[in-house]
From Swiss-Prot:
Protein name: Phosphoglucomutase
Role description: This enzyme participates in both the breakdown and synthesis of glucose.
Residues forming the catalytic site: S117
Residues at which Mg(2+) binds: S117, D289, D291, D293
Primary gene name: pgm
Binding site for substrate: T20, R24, S117, H118, K131, D293, R294, T352, E371, E372, S373, K384, R509
EC number: 5.4.2.2
Length: 553
């Protein structure tokens, strides 16, 4: 195959920003705006420090609409910049955690991940996304994404290779391309290969398979018709021995079959209604988002919040072979995540965004980290990992059942944890697609009033109100304006922040976190006073016109 480098003028396109984890835009906007992807991909190559000289790059994605078009453009821009070692997942597939593992195992300089994560997919009403990962396997840090955004705002020229015939990537193997006298190779690989090898280093699959067989474990796994479908069959059916009937929505589709791939109680209702009832035939259930980095854990009679999952993993790490082999050095959580894990061990508190865990993992300060937004992961790779978290829970069930000489369920583990450590009652309100200026005005009002605001929580006085600022203990960098906190004398917290993962307008997220030794109370009653205070101090209805949240998690 032959390629020729072409250059042509362009003008900047507004709104090409990277948010919490990459570019997120409506697919229709990306498709219908001339040079949208060409501009942004060129900006990435112009500005990212790990793309300034040719090295090995990895490209994959969650299978959503426009991913194949984006992959073609990334390859052709890479060729035009002299890159000769390009690795892509067959048919463009590669989950985010799998790509992180592939970057690390193949010693690549960078990875392009085509995903809008938990956002819907499709031509008309779906989103498209693109993010850049670094040589450590983790998301590009703020200093890199800021430079990419600046390049996109000032771009004047598109540089791209034109191919003499279409590039097809539906067969594993090497494709040789001659570009301007250089021979480049596009390696089309099995997107499972490196990730499954990594999982074998983390878990004892033979032991887990024996446990599943011994207790006839009934499991349901929802892949939302996204990329984890191809991984779920390998992991849960081939390696654990579960029947294929355990898998739901396991065939990847460009529009995810119309499903909203956000693994929470609202959008994973099919799984929740099947597994959580006390008379459910299922012992445990899992759901994973579009690109496979988020997880939902439910059991018969039990929903395991991400915050509780992180806390329980922190107490049961000796049941997880990865930590037995590599040691358990510490835990980090994002600031809005509940303080459940704080009652178990000392923690490092970071802003929302997995990239903030990267320095801590690279420096050996932490082994486990998690976010309230259904993300859990370890230092084995540099992305959160839904399947990894699910296998941790299977490992814990196996170990607890071996100790008890009977099948121990999710509900029993959860309640035993609460009985010992107490319970953090926790809820998140999402106000989606609100007017961006109104949301920003509301946040600024609370910042302005932070030092003078007066409120109490059913008689418990306010301890302080601030705008969370993070000081990185590794590189000394400071990240400000990461969420407004109302912290009360009993440790209860109300938190407001604007999400960086939406594609339209703004999403206001309000978090409620209250600790109690009484773990059997009604959650809504426990948090009712906090909700009333939150509406009052934020004036959210006045600013947005919304009386109720779009989603409650």
């Amino acid at each position: 195959m032959q390629a020729t480098v072409k250059r042509y003028p362009t003008t900047p396109i507004s709104g090409q920003t990277m948010g919490t984890s990459g570019l997120r835009k409506r697919a229709s906007e990306v498709e219908n705006t001339p040079n949208y992807l060409e501009n942004f991909v060129n900006a990435m190559f112009n500005a990212a420090s790990n793309l300034q000289k040719p090295g090995k790059i990895i490209i994959g994605g969650d299978g959503r609409y426009l991913n194949l078009k984006a992959l073609d453009i990334i390859i052709r821009v890479a060729l035009s910049r002299g890159f000769t070692d390009i690795v892509v997942g067959k048919s463009g597939f590669m989950s985010t955690p799998a790509e992180s593992a592939t970057i690390i195992r193949r010693k690549a300089e960078a990875g392009f991940i085509m995903t809008a994560s938990h956002n819907p997919a499709g031509k008309d009403h779906g989103d498209f996304g693109l993010k850049l990962n670094m040589s450590n396997g983790g998301p590009a840090p703020l200093e890199v994404t800021s430079k990419i955004e600046e390049s996109a705002r000032n771009i004047k020229e598109i540089v791209i290779a034109e191919l003499n015939k279409p590039l097809t990537i539906d067969t594993i193997g090497d494709i040789e391309i001659e570009c301007e006298g250089k021979k480049a190779i596009v390696h089309v690989i099995d997107p499972l290969e490196d990730y499954i090898a990594y999982l074998h280093e983390c878990f004892d699959f033979e032991k887990l398979k024996q446990f599943v067989s011994k207790y006839h474990l009934k499991v349901q796994v929802d892949g939302f018709n996204a990329v984890t479908g191809i991984y779920n069959k390998k992991v849960f059916c081939e390696l654990l021995g579960l029947p294929e009937s355990s898998l739901k929505n396991a065939i990847p589709m460009p529009d995810f079959g119309g499903k909203h791939p956000d693994p929470n109680l609202t959008y994973a209702a099919e799984l929740v209604h099947a597994v959580i009832p006390e008379d459910s035939p299922y012992d445990i259930g899992f759901a994973f988002d579009g690109d496979g980095d988020r997880n939902l854990i439910v059991g018969r009679g039990a929903f395991v919040s991400p915050s509780d999952s992180l806390a329980i993993l922190s107490t049961k790490y000796n049941d997880i072979p990865f930590f037995v082999k590599n040691g358990f050095k510490g835990v980090a959580r994002s600031m809005p995540t509940s303080a459940a894990v704080d009652h178990v061990t000392s923690i490092t508190e970071t802003p929302t965004g997995w990239k903030f865990f990267g320095n801590l993992m690279d420096s050996g300060k932490i082994s486990l980290c998690g976010e309230e937004s259904f993300g859990t992961g370890c230092c084995g790779i540099r992305e959160k990992d839904g399947i990894w978290a699910a296998l941790c829970w299977v490992s814990i069930l196996a170990a607890e059942s071996e100790r008890a000489q009977r099948l121990v369920g999710v509900k029993e583990i959860l309640e035993n944890h609460w009985a010992k450590y107490g319970r953090n009652y926790y809820q998140r309100y999402d106000f989606d697609e609100v007017d961006k200026k109104a949301a920003e005005d509301m946040m600024q009002m609370m910042r302005d009033n932070a030092k003078t605001v007066k409120c109490d929580l059913n008689g418990v006085p306010l301890k302080f109100c601030d705008d969370f600022e993070y000081h990185d203990s590794v590189d000394g960098s400071v990240t400000s304006k990461q969420g407004i906190r109302f912290v009360f004398e009993d440790g209860s917290r109300i938190i407001f922040r604007l999400s960086g993962t939406g594609s339209v307008g703004a999403t206001i997220r309000v978090y409620f976190d209250k600790y109690s030794k009484d773990y059997k109370a009604d959650q809504n009653k426990m948090l009712a006073d906090m909700v009333t205070v939150a509406y009052a101090v934020s004036q959210i209805t006045k600013f947005t016109g919304r009386e109720k949240p779009s989603v409650v998690t």
